[in-house]
Design a protein with these regions (language model features):
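Glycan-recognition and catalytic cores of secretory/periplasmic carbohydrate-active enzymes
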Residues: 1-249
Length: 249
């Protein structure tokens, strides 16, 4: 149980799922749990700020919208300013994928889109900061530029600006899933001009076509998408299903 009391990306993803469950069902117990979780973590003291510890901020911002509790609002404003002006940048101004205990010098990872960019985008809408919204869109474009594999429609996990390479050029399932569900979330969070919206949708559809081509017979996806000898991975499969369903809707 103790690991669920940590402030990290894994908890952040789960919290966002719980918040969306609350919005769907109106279950007040779920919302009260979320408020209690944030109150307890804030009382304990928050961890260092990085890409992954930004993930829980997305749901906190949602909770702030519903409660207008300025304890939450003040933290969200301050953290969003840190993302915009304090988070380390690497090549082309991309957010460096700095995480707890590792700065990941000069490295870009696709995970950042879900972990950090979604929060910045929503903060731009909630706080009326157009610069946040524009930066969120730009970060998506830069990540697509370096991580999208035009030969097949899938994504590489990362890019090293020092070595100028995509590591082993591996199409990792969970990494790809951050784009599948993340880009659908982004489109729902912020206003996007028609041309850019179409571009995001086109890259999404190209990825989905590629994913369908490498889906296993039982509906799962392998952890290396185009390597059927690699094990099947449930978290990526769930994220792909989520993103695809949201795309259809």
């Amino acid at each position: 149980i103790s690991k669920y009391q940590l402030w990290e990306w894994t908890q952040g993803v789960g919290l966002y799922g719980l918040y969306n469950y609350y919005k769907l069902t109106g279950d007040r117990g779920t919302f009260d749990f979320l408020c209690g979780w944030y109150d307890a973590r804030m009382a304990e003291g928050l961890p260092e700020r990085n890409v992954n510890t930004t993930c829980p901020m997305l749901t906190l911002l949602c909770v702030y919208e519903d409660t207008q509790d300025e304890r939450y609002g003040a933290l969200c404003r301050d953290w969003a300013e840190w993302v915009m002006h304090g988070l380390i940048r690497t090549g082309d101004g991309a957010f460096q994928h700095m995480i707890t205990g590792d700065a990941n010098d000069s490295q870009m990872l696709i995970d950042t889109l879900f972990m950090t960019v979604l929060f910045l985008a929503k903060a731009g809408v909630v706080f009326g900061r157009k610069d946040y919204v524009e930066e969120a869109k730009r970060q998506c474009l830069v990540h697509i530029k370096y991580l999208y594999d035009t030969s097949c429609g899938l994504y590489f996990h990362g890019y090293d600006f020092k070595g100028r390479h995509n590591y082993g050029r591996v199409h990792w399932a969970r990494g790809n899933s951050w784009y599948t569900c993340g880009i659908m979330e982004l489109i729902g969070l912020i206003p996007i001009e028609p041309g850019l919206r179409q571009y995001f949708l086109d890259t999404f559809r190209a990825q989905v076509d590629a994913l369908c081509a490498c889906q296993a017979g039982d509906g799962m996806w392998h952890t290396i998408l185009d390597d059927p000898a690699s094990y099947k991975e449930s978290s990526a499969t769930a994220a792909f299903a989520y993103g695809m369903l949201k795309g259809v809707r």
